[in-house]
Amino acid sequence: MSKALLAAWRINSLAPAPYPERLDTNDNALDRFLGSSLGQARLWASHLRLKRLRSFADKVVHRSNALSALSEAELAACVDDLRVKLARQGLTEDLTIEVFSLVREVCGRKLGLRHFPVQLIGGRVILAGKLAEMQTGEGKSLTAVLPAIAVALSGLPVHVITVNEYLVRRDARFMRPVYEFFGLDVGMVVPDQDPETRRNAYGCDVTYCVNKDLVFDYLRDRIDSNRDVSDARRAVARLFRGDENSRAYLRGLFFGIVDEADSVLIDEARTPLIISSSVSDKQGVDDYRRALDFCRQLRDGLHFRIFAADKLIQLTPAGRDHITNICGNLPGVWQVARARFELIEQALAAQLLYMRDKHYIVKDEKVQIVDEYTGRVMSDRTWESGLHQMIEVKEGCALTDRRKTISRITYQRFFRRYLRLGGMTGTAAEVVGELSAIFGLDVLRIPTNRAVQRKNLGTRIFLDTASRWDAVLKSIRRVRDEGRPVLIGTRSVAASEHLSSLLKTEGIEHSVINARQDEDEATVVEQAGRVGRVTVATNMAGRGTDIKLESGVSDRGGLHVILSEFHESPRIDRQLYGRAGRQGDKGSYESIVSLEDELFVLFSGEMARRVMSNSSFSNVITGMKAKLLRGSAQRSSERYYSRIRRQTVLEDQRLAKMLAFAGRGE
């Protein structure tokens, strides 16, 4: 292990800081270019580094096999001895081998699972502050235990960060016996916890948490401890208040292990996370209703322009004139030009860009936002600038208070503050340059433990949505008749429920997982690998979902996955495909989509229109033409969203400078 890594884990070097975290740095364009280029080069050279890591894994396996002869008491004594050595020496290479060997043996005894060499390599990569690209189904949750215990035994807090509450509960509960054997306590941060329970969870040696919850708790700490003022003022405050960290949720940002790292660090990094407070709303229900009524009189292209990818609508000069004419005699907000135009633009967005059962659901007479990446409800989140209230009026729900921003931070800024950050994902190759340039994270591609037997049955792009669903139904019948389970992935609640209604009409028994039907998620996932089982799911059944096959299913061909709509990135598609053919099992997948899907409409509109109007095509596009059409749309989408993320970083840096000049933080 390098001297730099060894120094990073010496407890004494970190102890004096009341809230340890890395200082912000502002990289210039050259830094980002060099970081991106180096990241791509290092990924390409992954195989050159694997030889040394395989030697490390072999030593761990050899030492672990020797430990198998020890009794429980003797194994516990080894743990006690290891603690003393770690306190004296830090995480040397030899002690890392010892830790991993003990963890492997304890996992075998407590869980019935012993790490494969590729998982040991993955754990070592994460411990070194890098990303391990491990294919779906290769046991990333078990891999994360290795670096988590190694660092926690050294006396430093560890955050295991994942994408949803289901995975937090599953992994923390399943791994608890292993942590407890090492004398480590494990906490879970989940929604709806009271503050004291949440503080206790962060006070544990290892804390499992969802990325959004973690960042919001960090922002709360900064608000509560006045960390948004200058260093000098904080020092004075500590003299009078004592330890400013005593009531904080977190103990600092020591070591973070990010599961599904590309989702957290890339896909969800387009917009900042904001903490807000309620403010009195100058607009009432009548103003919102009036705005919704007025916008129905406006025509696309003449009075306003839609920028669907940006979720933005702008009034044209003709539209502004029209609104001014029809509301000139109205009182209040309608007399202020900027305010009335913003109100109309929000009404247009609520009507045309934010769709029920896609971007939100109405549950218990409340508008609840659906996370587009996880497919899950974010019940405590709201849209800003009056948009949420506009949608509430649109749906006939009770009006909630508007919100005022009091603290904000981007994912890019937050995760760069960890003293050490590592992670894992099955899909990092396409964004390795950005991960390296922004977060300083190198990616190492880890080979699979067994040969992958997942078959690609191809892509079919239909000209219309109805034809797509007909083809999906036929494929479901075929696979079910073979006695194989089938998982159909959709991108929205509405699409999943539409397919469910079609299946009911056909008399096909099935289960549904979406933001509205999530109470029995664990049971549905548990049964999804049974003979002839049909499961319809949004992205809730994507990342991290482990569908175990019933005995005999693999011999019939395994789980079959149908993707019914492409995502903006092929990485997200591959996550769904990866539910099949895990750990060497047989499996297959296919894509059955429509040119009317959002990806093609937004990012391949002209090409899609030419295809649809070309009589030489039949009702379906397959083969190389389908591959080219998909590739063109997804490349355009990825370039667009990459620019958005770069702009987010630059805007964040500019805002930070302005706030620093004013003596404030986030």
Swiss-Prot record:
Species this protein is from: Nitrosospira multiformis (strain ATCC 25196 / NCIMB 11849 / C 71)
GO MF annotations in UniProt: ATP binding; protein-exporting ATPase activity
Encoding gene (name): secA2
Function: Part of the Sec protein translocase complex. Interacts with the SecYEG preprotein conducting channel. Has a central role in coupling the hydrolysis of ATP to the transfer of proteins into and across the cell membrane, serving both as a receptor for the preprotein-SecB complex and as an ATP-driven molecular motor driving the stepwise translocation of polypeptide chains across the membrane.
Gene Ontology biological process terms in this record: intracellular protein transmembrane transport; protein import; protein targeting; protein transport by the Sec complex
Top enzyme class: translocase
Entry-linked SMART domains: SecA_DEAD, SecA_PP_bind
Family as reported in the entry's similarity comment: Belongs to the SecA family.
Bilayer disposition of the protein: Peripheral membrane protein
EC number of this enzyme: 7.4.2.8
Protein name as it appears in the record: Protein translocase subunit SecA 2
Keyword Electron transport in record: no
Substrates-to-products reaction catalysed: ATP + H2O + cellular proteinSide 1 = ADP + phosphate + cellular proteinSide 2
InterPro entries: Helicase_ATP-bd (IPR014001), Helicase_C-like (IPR001650), P-loop_NTPase (IPR027417), SecA (IPR000185), SecA_CS (IPR020937), SecA_DEAD (IPR011115), SecA_motor_DEAD (IPR014018), SecA_preprotein_X-link_dom (IPR011130)
Classification via SUPFAM superfamilies: P-loop containing nucleoside triphosphate hydrolases, Pre-protein crosslinking domain of SecA
Location(s), subcellular: Cell inner membrane; Cytoplasm
Keyword Protein transport: yes
Ligand binding (ATP): Q119, G137, E138, G139, K140, S141, D546
Keywords: ATP-binding, Cell inner membrane, Cell membrane, Cytoplasm, Membrane, Nucleotide-binding, Protein transport, Translocase, Translocation, Transport
Oligomer and partners: Monomer and homodimer. Part of the essential Sec protein translocation apparatus which comprises SecA, SecYEG and auxiliary proteins SecDF-YajC and YidC.
